[in-house]
Amino acid sequence: MTSLSAKIQDVFDEPACDTNRGKDAKARKEGCSKPLTPGASAGGCAFDGAKIVLQPITDVAHLVHAPLACEGNSWDNRGAASSGPTLWRTSFTTDLTELDIVMGQGERKLFKAIREIKETYAPPAVFVYSTCVTALIGDDIEAVCKRAAEKFGLAVVPINAPGLAGSKNLGNKLAAEALLDHVIGTVEPDDAGPYDINILGEFNLSGEFWLVKPLLDRLGIRVRACIPGDARYIDVASAHRARAAMMVCSSALINLARKMEERWDIPYFEGSFYGITDTSEALRNIAELLVRKGADAEILDRTETLIAEQEAIAWKKLEAYRRRLQGKRVLLNTGGVKSWSVVHALMEIGMEIVGTSVKKSTVEDKERIKRILKDENHMFEQMAARDLYAMLSKHKADIMLSGGRTQFVALKAKTPWLDINQERQHPYAGYDGMVELVRQIDLAIHNPIWGQVREPAPWDCQPAREDDLASAKNGTATVNAFNEFAGAMAHRFGDR
């Protein structure tokens, strides 16, 4: 745990973060995230954060050294997608029991599990995750991984990020440190070129990076490694030979980008593929960085030509939606990079942002929101479900974009809702992704079901019926009138 403590302190000292630089030594040791409330929600620990960052590496066997619940509770917490290997969809755990812990069999069981994975699946690497239990009982996973790597002839990488170490964000950064210490730089590619880039902090949710990669392909830009979305182990291992990098989610992997620049002189910038303007700006920045690193300057002209073509196509598709969505009010209850990138994207088509959550956003994210919205009145750290319901039930927003945890608040308030977090089913990146996002918003807002659910329920109309019945003398008179009507009708039909 001594090495883990040292690694945590190193992660908390981040020169690439101006906010971190502005803190004193005591505040820096506390990290960026607020302390967790035990039992408040599932996930959110350092182990969960490490698993989020590394599991999308698709051809690696991810082995959790823990009781079964640790793997079960963290399973499938990101809707990443793979274009090839499916090994990452197989769950591996040592399934420690009380007897294993009491008898000190943890390390031996881990070694046997690595051997079984090697013999059955033959992956290029095995990532071994420590957890609270194995950290507390003192299992030395680094020693076991080193011994297994020598014995079986494959990369066995220790991921020392037990849940008790801290927040999910800390786990993201500890996972990045594991890649830097054990993976990146271990393979020398034989095809490195002047147009190779890395994409950092892109998780390929719902396969959305596949909407961006064709644009880079048309420019002759090769993605050496997308970390972690749809990645392969050998791509990550050779990522140190890229010429430039784009950071998509700095709150998760800023330490990875900064240290790769220090060690291998790979310049990076932070950008977004959400929205037309941001996608175009990201392509320009990538081209400019490559030119600075020696690529032919003609790529700048080709980039502008591609941007003009794609923007024209996208705006033509969006024109029909603009008329239907102009002035519609949106509440964003998300965080991180989406707190500003999606805001910018929606404002491009004339939608009004009534609020955006900054709970998981960095100080830099908040500054971007201020510049986009021109003030900070629409930013909120956290909104209780009761306040959220009150806002939506008073029709202060036409739609809410959030994750699954708050969808039922919107549905209870009879307000359209769209999933925009990691569980989403549709890709929203790039030019085509922007069109898809707007299409989904339009479908949600103009779904005819909302007109029906907002109508008064039949039982809510009961008082009016009682008023009508009150005009009769009493219940008996009503029955008599009905009997007279029935008799008259029977007599009429009988006459025929």
From Swiss-Prot:
Which Gene Ontology terms cover its molecular function?
nitrogenase activity
What name has this protein been given in UniProt?
Nitrogenase iron-molybdenum cofactor biosynthesis protein NifE
Source superkingdom: Bacteria
Job of this protein = This protein may play a role in the biosynthesis of the prosthetic group of nitrogenase (FeMo cofactor).
For the keyword Transmembrane, the answer is no
> Is Aminoacyl-tRNA synthetase included in the keywords of this UniProt record?
no
Note the InterPro entries from the entry. Nase/OxRdtase_comp1, Nase_comp1_CS, NifE, NifE-like
Alphabetized, the UniProt keywords read: Nitrogen fixation
Q: Which organism is it from?
A: Mesorhizobium japonicum (strain LMG 29417 / CECT 9101 / MAFF 303099)
The UniProt family comment states: Belongs to the NifD/NifK/NifE/NifN family.
The pathway to which it is assigned is: Cofactor biosynthesis; Fe-Mo cofactor biosynthesis
The record's listing under NCBIfam families reads:
nifE (TIGR01283)
User: Which Pfam families does the record match to this protein?
Assistant: Oxidored_nitro
One of its GO biological process terms is: nitrogen fixation
